[in-house]
Structure formats: C-alpha cells, structure tokens
Amino acid sequence: MNRIIPPENLPELLERAHMMAGVSLAQIAAQRGLSVPKDLKRDKGWVGQLIEMELGATAGSKPEQDFLHLGVELKTIPIDSQGRPLETTYVCVAPLSNIQGLTWQNSLVCHKLQRVLWVPVEGERHIPVAERRIGTPILWEPDPQELQLLQQDWEEIMELIALGKVEKLTARHGEVLQLRPKAANSKALTQSIAEDGSLKMTNPRGFYLKTSFTAMILNKVFG
C-alpha cells in the first residue's frame, strides 16, 4: 500500500477532496488494497481513517490538526438521504486535570476548529458500507457567532471540570459542544479533579459537536 504524500497547499487538498465526491468507499479501499468491513460496529473509525489516508493527512492520533502545515482539520460526517448529520462529531480528548491557565484561545478544541474540511459520507445503516458514497466536501471556518457559541460552551464545561463536577456533566450540557465519555472500554481510567480539589480516577471524556450545530454548517452550504 503506497502512502499518499500530503498535499502541498490548500487548493491541492480541496482538489483531492472534490475528486472523491460521488465515489464509493469500496472504490477508495480497492485503490489502497484494503478490505471493507461488513459493518462499523468494531471499526467505528474506519471511514475516517480511509479518507485521511486518501487525502494524505499527517496527524494520525496526535493532538494537532490533520493538515497542520495547512491549518486544516479533517472531519468525516455520516449523513442521511436528506443531508442531515447522523451522529455527533468527535473533536478531541478533554483535559480533566492540570488545567490551570488553560484558556479557550490556547485550547485544543479552538486549535482544531479554526478551519475544518468536512467530508460528508452516506451513513444510513441500510446502505452496505462498501456501497456508501462520499459527498461534496465543505471547507468551513467558524464565523464570529459560531466561535462565540463554541467558546461559551467550552468555558462553561471547563469551569465545571475545574470545580470537580465532571461526573455531573451530561451530553445535554452545552448548546453546540458537549462532553461525553470517550473510551470504548468503560474500564479505561484517567485522572480528574475531585470536588475537594484532590485528584480522582474517572473515565476519559471527549468534546463532541452536537448534530444541531453540524446540521447548521451543512445547511449553510447545501441549503
């Protein structure tokens, strides 16, 4: 399997993404010599990894943008036949300890969401994974109102984490951004701040964009 060279500039990245529009996941996988999983129950990240590979993304699981040299984060988004997102979008792991001095401006969420290349993919379960097609990509930069909503949610969530209230945070908190347990394995543990200021063990959490927010982004482009 040949490794794809990262795109040199933004027009090249966009050209690659547009060339995938209308193509099935099976076609992309065949070009890379990969087999397509029957379903995504055990391979939840497979589609995203395939698209990353095809576009030449470099970050992998590192805490930085997928195309750091271009200032672009890549997000695949499963959609229904009406073009609506089918699930929330994972942004990054949430820091649950050592958060003194952390601000929105220097947070990983802010860094990742400065500029996002959204790649919609058919995601309805009745369509076999191999036959699901890739949609038209969208390059998005949050406008001032969207940035304000993201910052507001992030600051409120981080304040509750700092107060040791991580267990009280549910997916309902936040207008556009939510905090949820991240690990597929519920036995995975990480340090977090307890209400008395000491450290305790808890399940890792991740930041996710709510579907109402990503639907708004898609709607602005596709109407």
Swiss-Prot record:
<dbReference type="InterPro" id="IPR011337">
    <property type="entry name" value="DNA_rep_MutH/RE_typeII_Sau3AI"/>
</dbReference>
<dbReference type="GO" id="GO:0006298">
    <property type="term" value="P:mismatch repair"/>
</dbReference>
<dbReference type="InterPro" id="IPR037057">
    <property type="entry name" value="DNA_rep_MutH/T2_RE_sf"/>
</dbReference>
<dbReference type="GO" id="GO:0003677">
    <property type="term" value="F:DNA binding"/>
</dbReference>
<comment type="similarity">
    <text>Belongs to the MutH family.</text>
</comment>
<dbReference type="GO" id="GO:0006304">
    <property type="term" value="P:DNA modification"/>
</dbReference>
<keyword id="KW-0540">Nuclease</keyword>
<keyword id="KW-0234">DNA repair</keyword>
<dbReference type="GO" id="GO:0005737">
    <property type="term" value="C:cytoplasm"/>
</dbReference>
<keyword id="KW-0255">Endonuclease</keyword>
<keyword id="KW-0378">Hydrolase</keyword>
<comment type="function">
    <text>Sequence-specific endonuclease that cleaves unmethylated GATC sequences. It is involved in DNA mismatch repair.</text>
</comment>
<dbReference type="GO" id="GO:0004519">
    <property type="term" value="F:endonuclease activity"/>
</dbReference>
<dbReference type="InterPro" id="IPR004230">
    <property type="entry name" value="DNA_mismatch_repair_MutH"/>
</dbReference>
<protein>
    <recommendedName>
        <fullName>DNA mismatch repair protein MutH</fullName>
    </recommendedName>
</protein>
<keyword id="KW-0963">Cytoplasm</keyword>
<dbReference type="Pfam" id="PF02976">
    <property type="entry name" value="MutH"/>
</dbReference>
<dbReference type="InterPro" id="IPR011335">
    <property type="entry name" value="Restrct_endonuc-II-like"/>
</dbReference>
<keyword id="KW-0227">DNA damage</keyword>
